[in-house]
Amino acid sequence: MYRILVINPGSSSTKVAVFEDEKKIAEKNLTHSAEELKKFKKSIDQEPLRRKAVEDFIDEVGYRIEDFSAIAARGGVLEPVPGGTYVVDEYMVDYLINRSPVDHVSNLAAVISYKLGKPYGIPCFVVDPVSVDEMCDEARFSGIPEIERKSYSHALNIKAVLRKVSREMGKTPEEVKIVVAHLGSGISVCACKNGKIIDVNNANDEGPFSIERTGELPVGDVVKTAYSSKHSAAELKEEFTKKGGLLAYLGTKDLRKALDSMETSRKAKLVVEAMAYQIAKEIGGMCAVLGDKPDAIVITGGMAHENRFVRMITDYIEKFGKVEVIPGELEMEALALGVLRVLRGEEKAKDYRSVIE
């Protein structure tokens, strides 16, 4: 039996869980107050605070660090890598602390795991990090040579969904062609073929607008805004990725509240319908690049809990193929199972430095 500690930081909380083989034994969402977090300039600076919270959880559930066979951590913004399970080592930790191109809370997980596990010789791993890049060559072109499209997505949940759906079909991930739409505070819509994410919108910069992100914007207007604005580049980036989308239009990040408002507000109705329209359009594009009719179109993520909203999307896309809805995220299970496959010898863990060099 393998006992695995799972660590998955979010913007204002850290999800932690204990698995014994495939079975989840304990789970908790460790919340961090805005007052606590605002003391830190960068996400990575929160590491001691969040590590202490994880240590307290371990004590609370009656374990010691040395009781674990391994630690599974959410993968941060690393250099582009193929999907898989990667060993957390000093090189990866240094990259996440000092060289990651994006200041994101996901960068914390591997650092926390390494500082917890290394003194006791506990192996630590990340699974399908945010920067999984398996895009086909054609998908990389942006329109100008100086800019290449980047693959930043909700890869962990997307890969978990791919495994789940293919297993239900009695096939391997390499044998199916599916489109996955992960709908959360950010949106990733991708085409999966031969077990790989061959195309995906960058969840920060492209695709549909979401709960708090603008998605793709007209280039001319972005340039005009940047040069006529008194805001810094960092402030504009925050405007586009944390203050855009549904929040900018309706002043709320609560999709359910926005859906309820549709009954009395024409504006709310139009905004929510526009978001569904843009998601459906992105799904249609991904269906096209698969080359064949998809085996399934999967809608997942937090927004997939809202049946009314899912229906708006499926009205557009059901003509393209079978639609399956998997609400929420499979991230904790995906992290544990990715590490379990390595511990059982079913899959070989990858060395991050070797892969990128």
Curated annotation (Swiss-Prot):
Subcellular location: Cytoplasm
Chief localisation class: cytoplasm
Disulfide cysteine pairs (residue numbers): none
Pfam families: Acetate_kinase
Superkingdom of source: Bacteria
Catalytic activity reported: butanoate + ATP = butanoyl phosphate + ADP
SUPFAM superfamilies in alphabetical order: Actin-like ATPase domain
Keywords for this protein: ATP-binding, Cytoplasm, Kinase, Nucleotide-binding, Transferase
A Gene Ontology biological process term: acetate metabolic process
GO CC term (a single one): cytoplasm
Signal peptide positions (record): none
InterPro entries in UniProt: Aliphatic_acid_kin_short-chain, Aliphatic_acid_kinase_CS, ATPase_NBD, Butyrate_kin
One MF annotation (Gene Ontology) recorded for this entry: ATP binding
EC number annotated for this UniProt entry: 2.7.2.7
Entry-linked PANTHER family: ACETATE KINASE, BUTYRATE KINASE 1-RELATED
Family: Belongs to the acetokinase family.
Entry protein name: Probable butyrate kinase
Lineage: Bacteria, Thermotogati, Thermotogota, Thermotogae, Thermotogales
